[in-house]
């Protein structure tokens, strides 16, 4: 693993407890939405990936998680925050990810809360069906494209920022950080964790394969 990427398999509150107030310049997180995505399908009749029968998306994170997240990070980008607004302060700087789904049964996009005092921004990158990831099957139910994370880093992170991800999932953010460091010279560091050991193992395998490639422009 790259020296600027540090990912552990543990509970996110245990991870955050080790860091002082305001240690991370930016947290980019994708916590459970509390809507049972593990029971949904990918549009082809197949169930979304759910390891070991764990219904991890039955509820949103507790108040203790949010207390720690806002303690250790100066700014936050939170996917699915429209399901957890009761935990969040008001903000004008939301993000809309346009998935380019067209006329089908999938959601047109997803929302992310940000703590930045900016106008709402939208970004479009197609993400339709089980094989949206450049023809590669997804390894996590809420996996997001690397291109989306690269856009977030380019527009919301600053050079040398310390980034936190408390729900690592498929590891797309790590591939994006590696690309932005190599191509844009951003000198970012990423600290993250994933609770599920199977998702963690799959993400580590994916990151090692992707970051070893000479070109990361996908």
What is each stretch, according to the model?
Residues 1-154, 158-164, 173-218:
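Class I S-adenosyl-L-methionine-dependent methyltransferase catalytic core
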Residues 169:
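Conserved glycine-rich SAM-binding loop
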């Amino acid at each position: 693993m790259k020296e600027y990427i540090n990912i552990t398999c543990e509970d996110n509150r245990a991870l955050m407890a080790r860091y002082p107030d305001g240690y991370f310049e930016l947290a980019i997180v994708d916590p459970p939405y509390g809507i049972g995505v593990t029971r949904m399908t990918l549009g082809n009749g197949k169930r979304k990936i759910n390891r070991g029968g764990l219904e991890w998306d039955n509820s949103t994170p507790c108040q203790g998680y949010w207390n720690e997240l806002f303690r250790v990070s100066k700014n936050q980008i939170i996917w699915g925050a429209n399901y957890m607004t009761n935990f969040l302060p008001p903000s004008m700087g939301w993000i809309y990810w346009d998935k380019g789904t067209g006329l089908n049964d999938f959601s047109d996009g997803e929302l992310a809360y940000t703590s930045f005092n900016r106008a709402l921004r939208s970004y479009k990158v197609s993400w339709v069906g089980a094989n949206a990831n450049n023809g590669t099957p997804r390894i996590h139910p809420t996996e997001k494209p690397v291109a989306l994370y690269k856009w977030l880093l380019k527009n919301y992170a600053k050079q040398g920022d310390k980034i936190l991800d408390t729900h690592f999932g498929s590891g797309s953010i790590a591939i994006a950080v590696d690309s932005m460091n190599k191509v844009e010279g951003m000198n970012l560091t990423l600290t993250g964790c994933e609770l599920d050991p199977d998702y963690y193992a799959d993400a580590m395998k994916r990151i090692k394969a992707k970051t070893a490639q000479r070109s990361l422009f996908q």
